[in-house]
Amino acid sequence: MYPDCDEILKMAPDYDIIPVCREIYADVITPITLLRKLAAVSKRYYLLESVEGGEKWGRYSFLGFDPVMRVKCSCGKVTIEKDGEETEKVTDKPLEVLREILKDYKAPRLAGLPPFAGGFVGYFAYAMIGYAEPKLKIKKGTFNDYDMMLFDKVIAYDHLKQKISIIVNMKTDKVMENYGKATAQIQDLANLIRSQQTADIPVSKSKIDFTCNVSKEEYCKLVEKTKEYIVDGDIFQAVISRQFSSRMREV
C-alpha cells in the first residue's frame, strides 16, 4: 500500500485528495473480467482502452465504478448530480463548470502511479465547438453537449507488468479516519477482483441499419469542389465528412 500514512500526513496540507494505491497480480484476470465484476456491484461503470499507432494496444486499461458526481450539459444548461440531489445552472461557458469543480480536487502526481488515477470520464459532443465559435451555429444533436462522471476509485490494468493497481482517492480533511476508509475500500475491491462474482453485460443483438445524410455521388462532388478551392487559393485545408446514423432499438 502506498503512500503510507506518514507520507500522506506530510502531503495533506497541500492537497484536497491523495490517491492511495495497492498492486496485485493479474494472473488470469482480463480487463473484460474486471468489467463484468464491476457490473455485478454497480449500474455505472466504465472501461477505457487505448491503442498506440493505430495497431498496438496501449499499456493500460482503466476501469471505474460508482461515480461521486455526474455533470451534463445541454444547450447551455448544466445539471450536476451529487449525493442524490440535482442542481442546475445556465451558462455560455459550460467548460468552466468542470474546471471549477476540479479546483476542489487538487491531488499530487505520485511516482509509480498509472497516468490516470481518478477524475472525469465521459464524452464531449461535436456541438461543444459551438460554445467557442458561436458564429458556426452548430445544429443541436440528440446527445448532451457533454456528459461527464467524476470517479474517485480507479482500477488500472497494466498489460506490461501483468499487474492491477487499485486506487482510491481519500480526502485530506480527516487523514487518519479517511486513510482507514481508503484502505478498507481497497481491500474490498481486491476481494471483489479475486472473487467469482460477475454479471453479464447487456449486448444488443438487433440488426443495425445506418442512414447517411450525403450520398456517395454528392460526397465525391464535394471533394472535387474542395480541391478546386485549394488550387484557387481560397482555402488550404478542409475536412469533409458524411454522417451515418441509426436509431437504437434496444440495449
Model-derived segments and spans:
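Extended alpha-helical targeting/anchoring segments
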Residues: M1-V251
